[in-house]
From Swiss-Prot:
Keywords: Chloroplast, Membrane, Plastid, Thylakoid, Transit peptide. Its main location: plastid. Belongs to the PsbU family. One of the extrinsic, lumenal subunits of photosystem II (PSII). PSII is a light-driven water plastoquinone oxidoreductase, using light energy to abstract electrons from H(2)O, generating a proton gradient subsequently used for ATP formation. The extrinsic proteins stabilize the structure of photosystem II oxygen-evolving complex (OEC), the ion environment of oxygen evolution and protect the OEC against heat-induced inactivation. GO terms for biological process: photosynthesis; photosystem II stabilization. This is Photosystem II extrinsic protein U, chloroplastic. The keyword Chloroplast applies. It is found in: Plastid, Chloroplast thylakoid membrane. The gene is psbU. PSII is composed of 1 copy each of membrane proteins PsbA, PsbB, PsbC, PsbD, PsbE, PsbF, PsbH, PsbI, PsbJ, PsbK, PsbL, PsbM, PsbT, PsbX, PsbY, PsbZ, Psb30/Ycf12, at least 3 peripheral proteins of the oxygen-evolving complex and a large number of cofactors. It forms dimeric complexes. The oxygen-evolving complex in red algae is composed of PsbO (OEC33), PsbQ', cytochrome c-550 and PsbU. It comes from Pyropia yezoensis.
Amino acid sequence: MDSTAFVGAAAPLRVAAAARSTICMAAADDKPVVSRRAALTGAAAAALAAVAGSLPALAETEYANVPFLGGSVIIDINNANVRAYAKYPGMYPTVAGLIATNGPFETVSDLYKIPGLTDLQIATLKKYEDKLVALTPTPEYELDKVNNGLYR
């Protein structure tokens, strides 16, 4: 009877007859081991899955207006966090909080329609009006406008 045994790399290997099943028995402990065919099939399937899985996801990876969230001189009043206004004296925290909680705004001039603004707050808004822009509100940044979870 023809048998197949996997002993080591240098050991002679006898090929099993074609009618035999793909599971072989190890000579040492008679436990089933995976045949070469099954191992190669599994490796080919894994390689195919790796290639198929490397196709690009068609998702937006970065918000195009990230610089206006506080990383530049101009701040987006519809998406920026209140901390972004700290670079302009008089804006943080009160005026910034009013902007974050009363938006969205169509234009920067809509800021003057916020109810309850004091004369000093209006003067502060006028002072930094050229540093503000009203971009399209993005839902991903709505929760982060007041508290983005970043602390010193």
